[in-house]
């Protein structure tokens, strides 16, 4: 009897987890948007989001990365007991690792030697996690009608990573042709030289939007499934 009560109460608690995931994701987005107004000196077309740490509002960037990581953690917790396949479980673990990378990025800013480690933990793991989890969720009741959005949003993660790589190579090549050295420990030029095609900043922001959309979509769809048919999300 006690086990039955626990099982019946657990889904409601997980909906609160979904709500928290959504709240922290939205707070992260709000922090990022506000940085564009608080620190307009960082041109969004070619300055990476992490460079806001060199401005006067590093604490807002800290909120951005922290809330992003917490949202990923909450989503991982939400899905851990919900997914059933080994691939899905592996995806949830990778999502938790990705959230850890995002949290570390809050503490290890762009000037810290471990900032690259944070990015390695946070970015590629999210791509694999979203694909593994999404391909499992599309087989579950309540997800079929939205599987197109689910899968497209998952595939958009790796597309956004490829976009960053391409635009980064284009920008670095342009800087080299202009005689400007760009690399670790080198400060970026104050003004973009003529002839340099620099869109990596936009690509960076597209990646963030794509990652956030997936988190929001998964958490919100979980909520909708529970409201429509609570039994579908019970263990």
Residue map of PLM features:
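Short, Lys/Arg-rich, polar N-terminal cytosolic tail immediately upstream
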Residues: 1-14
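Membrane-interface helix-boundary motifs at transmembrane edges
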Residues: 10-13, 78-90, 138-152, 224-230
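Hydrophobic alpha-helical membrane-insertion segments
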Residues: 20-31, 151-173
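Short, membrane-exposed interhelical loops at transmembrane-helix boundaries
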Residues: 49-51, 177-201
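Interfacial helix-start motif at the membrane-water boundary
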Residues: 51-70
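Alpha-helical transmembrane segments in multipass membrane proteins, preferentially the mid-helix core
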Residues: 75-77, 127-146, 157-171, 218-219
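Membrane-proximal helix-loop-helix units in multi-pass membrane proteins
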Residues: 100-149
